[in-house]
From Swiss-Prot:
It holds the Pfam family APS_kinase. GO terms for biological process: hydrogen sulfide biosynthetic process; sulfate assimilation. SUPFAM superfamilies: P-loop containing nucleoside triphosphate hydrolases. GO terms for molecular function: adenylylsulfate kinase activity; ATP binding. This is Adenylyl-sulfate kinase. It comes from Staphylococcus saprophyticus subsp. saprophyticus (strain ATCC 15305 / DSM 20229 / NCIMB 8711 / NCTC 7292 / S-41). It catalyses: adenosine 5'-phosphosulfate + ATP = 3'-phosphoadenylyl sulfate + ADP + H(+). Coiled coil: none annotated. Catalyzes the synthesis of activated sulfate. Pathway: Sulfur metabolism; hydrogen sulfide biosynthesis; sulfite from sulfate: step 2/3. The active site is at 108 (phosphoserine intermediate). Its EC number is 2.7.1.25. It is an enzyme of class 2 (transferase).
Length: 204
């Protein structure tokens, strides 16, 4: 891919801090990671709704949705998976700069790729949430029928079946989606945001 050296970064007249003060909350990336069927999308949708009801400015990026547009030229090879997460990381960084709480739901199977996104952001701007769930339970849910297709050889490189998933080394939050309800999971995340002062920024 060709790149250009003749580009300049243009600073905005409105800073990230000013946007956070206007919104009265800090901006951050809430990054859900876990196997297909572990509950990432379900919990992220419920979290977005709960935060919206509290007048929090959010946007949710979903793994399937971005492949309809931004990443529709990517497949599921290790190289394409890496590029998929790199692009989402850059988009998430822009949204954090815009003052939003950005909720992402991606399998994001590789620790190194998740760490690269974390390193794009400032300190405390990345909250990794691991939706912990056994492969057996994920496969029994199989909301899209993908596990069965992978078992039948119709899908190659499917995470958990014939491609690896690396559990997070030290996530900020672990949700046991085999035990915890959606409501419990959402409350756990919101409690974390409150305790760590993400939801209380006073306007100047």
């Amino acid at each position: 891919m060709a790149t250009s050296n003749h580009i300049t970064w243009h600073e905005s007249a409105v800073t990230k801090v000013e946007r956070q003060q206007r919104n009265q909350h800090r901006s951050v990336v809430i990054w859900f990671t876990g196997l297909s069927g572990s509950g990432k999308s379900t919990i992220s949708v419920a979290l977005e709704k709960a935060l919206y009801q509290q007048q929090v400015h959010t946007y949710r990026l979903d793994g399937d949705n971005v492949r309809h547009g931004l990443n529709n030229n990517l497949g599921f090879s290790p190289e394409d998976r890496k590029e998929n997460i790199r692009r989402i990381g850059e988009v998430s960084k822009l949204m954090v700069d815009a003052g939003l709480i950005t909720i992402t739901a991606f399998i994001s199977p590789y620790q190194a790729d998740r760490d690269e996104v974390r390193n794009l952001l400032d300190d405390k701007e990345f909250i990794e949430i691991y939706t912990s769930c056994s492969i057996e339970t994920c496969e029994s849910r199989d909301p899209k029928g993908l596990y069965q297709k992978a078992r039948n050889g119709e899908i190659k490189g499917f995470t958990g079946i014939n491609a690896p998933y690396e559990e997070p080394n030290n996530p900020e939050i672990i949700i046991d989606t085999e035990q915890d309800s959606i409501e419990t999971a959402v409350n756990q995340i919101i409690d974390y945001l409150k305790v760590h002062d993400y939801l209380d920024v006073k306007p100047v």
